[in-house]
Amino acid sequence: MKCLKKFAWVKLSRYEIPLHAKGIMIYFLRLASRAAFRKGTARYCGHINAVDVGSWVGGMVGLKSILEVKKRRDALEIMDELQMLGYITYTLDSSTKILTYKISDWVLKCSGKACKEGNNIYTTPDYGFLCMPRNITERLVEMGHKFGEADAWLDLWCHTVYRDKGNAFSFLAPAVQYGKFSSVLTLETLGKRWKWEKTKVWRFFQFYCAYFPLHRLPGSFGCVIYNRCYPTQDECDDPSDEEIMRILELIRIKARNTHTEGADNERINRFVAWKSRKVIQELEDEYTKEEIQ
């Protein structure tokens, strides 16, 4: 199953969400994970309430449980910040104490059919997956928000591509790519994006190496970052250094007569975008010949 850069959304298994991590997006993921995956009704304190797709209806106790906070004030501050950022809308009825929130970026294609009262409309914790808009973290970047760990984690996940012909490295396994010319990344680039120092970026990848292994390229080219846990229908082993270097070598060979200005990282990113299609075709031809033999 491909995950092309042009796709507007990516899949995120609820089981993979790093619930221990800090950052505003972990609260968003908690809320999204408990929202209704299809239209229906739900009971709260004897009342039957209509629940729309991507919404949740309940009380403050339930909300605090979802967010895993103890104080009402803390829960409402989180909801206010998420609403200010445009990730949710919510209302709290002062008379009935019923709180309703709706995920603004809900992907309707992932929703099931409407169901009648008595059937389950909410998801089971740690089961299934969320459909996340690929650009969901961009507003944090645009607002100059300093990322938390969960924000950075989701940022990498939502910029995962797989078998995209503009990135030959993604034919080995799901890889992280920011834009057409950003398949090879540097710690400095990510630090600038997340408002982190380089050493903090390095510690992040050391801690989350089970999710996002780094593969350093020679010199000052940068790193290829893979997403080890992204769901595919293929069995993807971790790419070996030999496989990655083979692709890099082919890209450089095909780009040897191509002149472009800029630092090494800028140049290699252009070469990857320009030459990946030819490299992929060559590797597929080699594989076909081996199969015939």
List the model feature ranges, each with a label.
Residues 7, 15, 32-34, 70, ...:
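Low-complexity, intrinsically disordered/propeptide-like segments
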Residues 94-114, 157-164, 218-239, 284-289:
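Short flexible/disordered coil segments
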Residues 164-165, 176-196, 232, 253-293:
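Append "and, occasionally, other polyanion-binding protein interfaces
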Residues 37-101, 164-228:
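Winged helix-turn-helix DNA-binding recognition segment
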Residues 105-143, 232-271:
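Short, amphipathic alpha-helical interaction segments positioned at domain boundaries
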